């Protein structure tokens, strides 16, 4: 059930080749190649990068690494220095790290994996570390860069060459640490091979991506790879999660040199939340830790965010920061974009935009809002499910909405290439009495804002920070936040 896979052995590149490559940027997308760059032509899941070698050369590639699987021959008309590398798909990250001079070894790289919570934790770690004097970069769902200045990205964990290029650039820009979301796809597809993780956090394991992994057992095994990583010093595990508790126990047996820190509400946790209170203004929590006990009051909402704070405390303290200073900076943290993001207008409903797109995340978001809901008020939930993804998750999302909300509006999410009504039809058996079924997500949001009472709470779930809606392969501009803000402004 648990994987002990470690990164592949270092790819040996002739020193002269490294000398020629030094100072150049590597890309695995020919469209990103500029004069003097290096093109890495891998075989991908859907496309073969070697077919783009001519385009990369036209764009100015000065060198090409290509996947040598025995069935490909270099065209002598491509008059560019090159080298074939066997199994390049899995070695690309290690290759790129070596070409860049392994500068990422000079960074404290913190990896965060789990079904939910990755974005919040990486954002908070970077912000908190910055406030503690550690210039910290971010790689993740919301974007790549530095806290408050992120460039949009298409993947939670980028392609392996892109990961190493980002780390190289961050180091050149003065970063001394990097907080990185590590997706199960990223681990399974070798996107993080070559990354020198120093500390890793496991948040939870709940149903998601079964269209890719097939079973929860396979999904969990992929996640566990990060904690058997060569050179890892700290494993920080949520033991309120069943799989996390099992993983923590296994790591303590398998890895005697690894510092394993458990966190959560559990009485067995090393970083234990011993007191928690919530209000519409935020929360207050008391943490017992190996470094002492302390209190933190923040504007964050939810028990799950208390767990996320505990993870941040564990990682930062394990990396040498004093507990009192860690708690001081965490008190200043704000929600990550699209994560329990509140829109408040006096005399109007409280609207909360959240990325919750799994049954567990939706259940937790709704239970958090039920805790702070005024007496006699209603909690609304506006949600849908993504197309071309795990269909079995759809009725579970519906059940979570019915269980946690007083009024449910079923709508579209990112239908992608599916008919949105078909997706809704998969949800509806679990939602026998919806307040409204509306394919048009903008109309659904406006309906909830218009119909809710002034003291009601509306959760708009599923898309969070996203500023697009994917319909038939085309991404149209769409922001839950913008639509809700406008609807609130127009409400009388």
Model-based region annotation:
Residues 1-22, 32-38, 44-51, 61, ...:
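ATP-dependent carboxylate-amine ligase
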Residues 2-111, 121-133, 268, 272, ...:
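Short, basic phosphate-binding NTP loop
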Residues 9, 90-239, 245-258, 310:
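Phosphate-binding loop of NTP-binding sites
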Residues 16-26, 93-95, 158-161, 180-186, ...:
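Short gly/ser/thr-rich secondary-structure transition/capping motifs
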Residues 57-59, 75-77, 193-196, 226-231, ...:
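Short, conserved loop/helix-junction motifs that constitute active-site signature segments
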Residues 65-73, 140-143, 240-242, 265-266, ...:
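Short, polar loop motifs at secondary-structure junctions
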Residues 67-69, 182, 204, 239, ...:
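Short secondary-structure boundary segments
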Residues 72-76, 188, 197-351, 428-432, ...:
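Acidic, Mg2+-coordinating active-site environments of NTP-dependent enzymes
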């Amino acid at each position: 059930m648990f994987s002990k896979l470690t990164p592949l052995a270092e790819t040996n590149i002739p020193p002269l080749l490294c000398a020629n490559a030094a100072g150049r940027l590597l890309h695995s997308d020919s469209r990103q190649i500029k004069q003097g760059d290096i093109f890495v032509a891998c075989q991908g899941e859907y496309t073969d990068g070697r077919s783009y070698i001519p385009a990369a050369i036209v764009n100015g590639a000065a060198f090409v690494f290509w996947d040598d699987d025995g069935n490909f021959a270099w065209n002598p008309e491509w008059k560019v220095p090159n080298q074939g590398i066997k199994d390049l798909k899995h070695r690309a990250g290690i290759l790129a790290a070596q070409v860049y001079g392994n500068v990422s070894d000079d960074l404290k790289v913190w990896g965060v994996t789990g079904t939910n919570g990755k974005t919040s934790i990486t954002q908070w770690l970077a912000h908190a570390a910055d406030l503690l004097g550690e210039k910290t970069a971010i790689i993740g769902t919301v974007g790549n860069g530095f806290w408050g200045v992120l460039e949009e990205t298409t993947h939670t964990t980028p392609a392996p060459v892109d990961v190493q290029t980002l780390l190289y650039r961050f180091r050149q820009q003065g970063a001394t640490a990097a907080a990185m979301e590590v997706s199960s796809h990223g681990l399974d597809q070798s996107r993080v091979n070559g990354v020198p993780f120093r500390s890793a956090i496991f948040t939870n394991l709940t149903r998601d991506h079964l269209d890719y992994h097939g079973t929860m057992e396979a999904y969990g095994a992929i996640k566990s790879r990060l904690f058997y990583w060569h050179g890892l010093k700290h494993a920080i595990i949520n033991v309120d999660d069943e799989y996390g508790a099992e993983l923590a126990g296994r790591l303590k047996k398998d890895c005697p040199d690894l510092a394993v820190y458990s966190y959560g509400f559990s009485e067995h946790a090393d970083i234990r939340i011993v007191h928690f209170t919530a209000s519409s203004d935020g929360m207050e929590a008391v943490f017992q830790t190996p470094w002492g006990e302390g209190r933190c009051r923040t504007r964050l909402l939810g028990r799950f965010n208390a767990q996320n704070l505990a993870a941040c405390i564990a990682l930062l303290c394990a990396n040498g920061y004093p507990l009192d200073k860690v708690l001081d900076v965490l008190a200043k943290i704000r929600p990550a974009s699209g994560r329990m993001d509140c829109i408040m207008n006096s005399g109007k409903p409280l609207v909360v935009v959240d990325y919750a797109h799994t049954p567990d995340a939706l259940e937790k978001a709704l239970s958090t809002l039920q805790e702070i809901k005024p007496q006699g008020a209603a909690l609304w939930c506006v949600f849908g499910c993504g197309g071309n993804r795990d269909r079995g998750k759809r009725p579970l999302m519906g059940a979570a909405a019915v269980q946690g909300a007083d009024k449910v509006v079923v709508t579209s999410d990112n239908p992608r290439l599916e008919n949105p009504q078909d997706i809704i039809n998969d949800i509806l058996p679990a939602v026998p009495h919806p307040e409204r079924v509306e394919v048009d997500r903008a109309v659904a949001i406006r309906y909830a804002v218009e119909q809710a009472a002034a003291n009601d709470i509306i959760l708009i779930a599923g898309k969070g920070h996203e500023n697009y809606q994917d319909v038939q392969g085309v991404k149209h501009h769409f922001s839950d936040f913008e639509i809700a803000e406008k609807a609130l402004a127009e409400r009388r």
